[in-house]
């Protein structure tokens, strides 16, 4: 719909000036919900009002008519805006904030009493551009990403930025790994070319990952335009100042910066130069595996019960975010992994230091996000105070290290704590300027210390002691005139005035007393001195707030000059938090330092699943540990055995141990020797409650296909019940072939759980495949799952025992036992004939009488009969009754 059509639709020509102003702004932001500031409220009109009233649960009213059409309206108080924004952002709406750029008085002075207050959009809030603490999760990043697919389509470029922390990164991603990389980052919003709207990629991003896509015209990503944006933003003359980057990376960075400029209205934070990373520096974990292993969220999308929630004992927000990033991006470089492990080991060996540091870290603030708010002019005095207190605490933390080690600290610890020395100049600046009781809102005043600026002190003196100055002036005028009854009073018409009785009028001789008003018994005067005092008193509040804002802006600009240092300090504190956290959980849960090799070792002794173990501990139960010994000669474990015996837990725990080890943490085991894993793949079905919705055979095959296509020799594959979604013969054939492919072609490490016992014969001709099963203890018809993985193959699945534990009716279990017995008496190759015989001999709706059930009923009946007491008639009736039972 073009502009003329829009104006016609909304009766623009007959609308009031204020409503025309609204429509002009709305027409320029049709893709947004427009919140229009009117006094103390943000109002919404027309369709926006109807939508917002439903989403926010607020009353829908009307604001008169526009022509014949009634104007729908709803609004929210300006001071509660963030509460309502939270709901809108959660629903993925794009919100434009339209503020008043002048006061009504200023508008009147500019254009008379009919002038409309000037308004404009000051910011557009989207899921990927939030910085408000109340609107974003404190313990995870909030990424905006731009994805650029070059014409060759072999490698895509991805730039992602967290506006709340000023982190900006660019990476080239193989086309086949785009979804996996997006799953790692979990961006809140993705910029994509309009040309890709109908592509399979866009469909997968939306349907599989459920991420918000914001489409932009193709020219938004144009190379020359994006290059100019980058050069202008970073004030560079040559794009090489960014580093060695491709054309598509330039487009990705430039489009992100342009989008930030459009949404923040030029008020973009001081972003550092983008960090260029190598995609292969991190372990690849596809989106399905992340979901199956519940790394940062559980199957419902919450953090509770996830690996992150189990490992996260950090004490700062920035530390929590860093741990989130570590878990999302395990390392693949042995040197870097060992560097982290050495840091963890240092703290594990110094638990007393850890205890002190963790207590001190609790006193620090999230200065990354404080700094962002400062650079975007959305901060308060409390942000500066947070920086001051953090600077102070940082120096104390450094003293803890030197008290214990002096100058003999390992180099890798020295490097971490170097920024903790503080910045005396910055600390003193804030300490000398910002009041300890500084309010959240600059408009409330009282943020600058009085002694910092004489004018601030003077204005606050007027505000606090105005009555005293009036009293002094009154005493002065009484002395000058000799009128002891002279008063200084106030009314809303003439303001402050000197009031004397009519009989004393002859005593007013000095011409400085200017007549204002005469009443029956009183005469009122003013003086230039009184008028000046009144003006100062009336304007003192406004003047001091204006002056404080000016001074505050200057202080903030000086803080921004220290941005690089503050980011290093934040990085140091978050790193300390994470590594102290690793030491803490290693001590608390008995974790061990893993050893890394450059071969295919995966030697875990007494490994445990950290999440399951913690859940069992809450119930005062013990976790049954297990070994896993994969190597070049024994790459594949084929695991058979009953359901509910712990197969899935065993599979997951080994994948999780690899992830934990490669983030630099100790692991839940007695010992661990691991050849670096470059990719982890996990195929686990819906029956294990780790995938939302109903799993299908096609979904299973698609995931298995992707695993076989993307795995390398250094990958770890976890497969659970491949082939179960189709017929037995098809399933066995597929599982067999998949195992052969992994063994002969991929030659990588694999844990393969199955209920197809036919596969166990493969160990006879696949030398790197070994059979393992779950230990079972049988006692009559009862079984006990021991949860131990042992060498060997299961001879049956014990499915009927699990069914009985699940509470299936006894008659169903008994009948199933009969049918199973017939199958077991017949060779596997004749299974089809068994079913045919059953269907031919028995009606579809008829079950052969259950002998076990009949026997139990007869036993029960006979137990109540005393033959010596039966009459002939009762005996005959009993015979008929028994006949009915059989």
Swiss-Prot record:
Tree of life domain: Bacteria
Coiled coil stretches, renumbered: none
Example of a GO biological process term: mismatch repair
Tagged with keyword Secreted: no
Keywords: ATP-binding, DNA damage, DNA repair, DNA-binding, Nucleotide-binding
Family: Belongs to the DNA mismatch repair MutS family.
Function: This protein is involved in the repair of mismatches in DNA. It is possible that it carries out the mismatch recognition step. This protein has a weak ATPase activity.
PANTHER family (alphabetical): DNA MISMATCH REPAIR PROTEIN MSH1, MITOCHONDRIAL (PTHR11361:SF34), DNA MISMATCH REPAIR PROTEIN MUTS FAMILY MEMBER (PTHR11361)
Identification of the protein by name: DNA mismatch repair protein MutS
